[in-house]
Curated annotation (Swiss-Prot):
Catalyzes the conversion of glucosamine-6-phosphate to glucosamine-1-phosphate. This is Phosphoglucosamine mutase. Belongs to the phosphohexose mutase family. The active site is at S112 (phosphoserine intermediate). It comes from Synechococcus sp. (strain RCC307). One of its GO terms (cellular component) is cytosol. Keywords: Isomerase, Magnesium, Metal-binding, Phosphoprotein. Mg(2+) binds at S112, D249, D251, D253. Its cofactor is Mg(2+).
């Protein structure tokens, strides 16, 4: 970390313009994500996290991970914190182990579903939940660099990779004795965090596993595979005659599935199926689920027809978590596959979700059977419009031409459709989503609004 040597005491170490997005701090390695920034994040996290218990530190398989972990460890120990490094693990392992071992908090080095050139830092508090906005702002204030860390104390470090077994034991115990004997299941491990435990755990529970992208590879993580690229999973399920398949993202905090017919089982369907099982067991208070504004109208109408309540939040699992805590809900999540079960920690967990979905099935029953009994999604399409100018992207609602066109689209579709436009919290993208009762309307309005946004915002 020679780049730190030229920084005199009292001057910033870098990161003055960095702030928390929807999922921690994330960006391109070497520009946004640097060792200097990671050292600062580690130091100020060490100052903000309460108590004097250890801080856990994990990473996904990205090539830049060890470099950033080393810098975070240096910053944390400089703040006087004891650090336990977990090595390669899923993000939810950090959250669950923080809670199990009563740690002060945890940091995960990962950029989730982003490309290999990116990396990021996710932070968790003592309960394993993501940091509060007040805690994030306290760290951001430190990153503005008005005072350089004194770096006068040094906490101890321990390598505790064996703790991953404690995490997998929690997952196995969540099934309460249910097994997966005889189930042929494809797992797309995405060259990422899921390679650390998912395949071995499914096999231990009796499943016949076909594993794709099953070794950690920092240069290939998320490339043409995983939860954002389902075709390899779908093809393998069909070729091997599997009952189902699961695709994880880079840090395994979310999962999408396909059934034996190759049909997508997204987060909405997972919530419906898992929620229905809980409701039938009288284990879903007020039959309430929490989802986001991205969830499908077909899901909402089917769940309401079943007698349930669906509460919607802004996009981001932290918003789902907050609403669940406020409402006393036990299950929530996102269409993208972040599913949170309050009975099993308050962090999205792709491996846990996959296990629970597979274990719902009765002998002789397939996932396709359950999907057939769920709901038909409204046609929905999402287009990403690249808008490099951050102010234009974040302030798209000030563009009268675009807001007028959105209002016209919503009026034309009436109660049978909707438009959702939002700026990504992690990428320079404006996301335009249209949902309607007919594919023709969806395609027309998605293309029209996306092209208009490109014309008006990129001038």
């Amino acid at each position: 970390m020679a780049d730190l040597a030229s920084h005199p005491v009292g001057q910033p170490l870098g990161g003055g313009g960095v702030s928390f997005g929807t999922d921690g701090i994330r960006g391109r390695v070497g520009t946004v994500m640097t060792p200097a920034l990671a050292l600062q994040v580690g130091y100020w996290s060490g100052q903000v996290l309460p108590g004097d218990a250890p801080v856990l530190l994990g990473m996904d398989s990205r090539s830049s991970g060890p470099m950033l972990v080393a810098a975070l460890e240096a910053g944390l120990t400089a703040a006087g914190r004891e650090v336990w490094t977990l090595g390669l693990c899923p993000t939810p392992a950090v959250a669950r182990l923080v809670n199990q071992f009563q740690a002060a908090g945890g940091l995960m080095v990962s950029a989730s579903h982003n490309p290999p050139e990116d990396n990021g830092i996710k932070l968790f508090g003592p309960s394993g939940a993501k940091l509060s906005r007040d805690q994030q702002q306290a760290i951001e204030a430190g990153l503005r660099g008005e005072v350089r860390p004194a770096l006068t104390s040094c906490g101890p470090t321990q390598r505790r990779t064996e703790l991953l077994e404690s995490y997998t034991a929690l997952l196995e115990n969540s099934l309460e004795g249910r097994r997966l004997d005889g189930r042929r299941i494809v797992l797309d491990l995405c060259w990422g965090s899921a390679t650390s435990c998912a395949e071995s755990l499914f096999r231990r529970l009796g499943a016949e596993v076909i594993a794709l992208h099953s070794q950690p590879d920092g240069a290939a993580i998320n490339v043409g595979c995983g939860s954002t690229h389902l075709e390899p999973l779908r093809q393998a399920v069909m070729e091997h005659g599997a009952e189902m398949g699961f695709a994880f993202d880079g840090d395994a905090d979310r999962v999408l599935a396909v059934d034996g017919q190759g049909r997508l089982v997204d987060g909405d369907h997972i919530l419906y199926l898992w929620g229905s099982a809980l409701a039938d067991a009288d284990a879903l208070p007020q039959q309430r689920l929490v989802a986001t504004v991205m969830s499908n109208l077909g899901f909402e109408r089917a769940w309401t027809a079943r007698g349930g309540q669906l509460e919607r939040t802004a996009v981001g699992d932290q918003h789902v978590h907050a609403a669940m805590a406020e409402l006393g809900a036990v299950l929530g999540g996102e269409q993208s596959g972040h599913i949170i079960s309050a009975d099993h920690g308050m962090s999205g967990d792709g491996v846990l979700t996959a296990l629970q979905l597979a274990a719902l099935l009765q002998p002789g029953e397939t996932l396709s059977d359950r999907v057939d009994q769920s709901f038909r999604s409204f046609p929905q399409r999402l287009r990403n419009v690249r808008v490099p100018d951050r102010d234009r992207r974040k302030g798209w609602q000030q563009c009268d031409g675009l807001t007028t066109a959105i209002a016209a689209a919503e009026a034309a579709m009436g109660d049978e459709g909707r438009v959702l436009v939002r700026a990504s919290g992690t990428e320079p993208l404006l996301r335009v989503m249209v949902e309607a009762s007919s594919q023709e309307q969806v395609d027309h309005w998605t293309d029209h609004l996306s092209e208009l946004a490109d014309q008006l915002l990129n001038v």
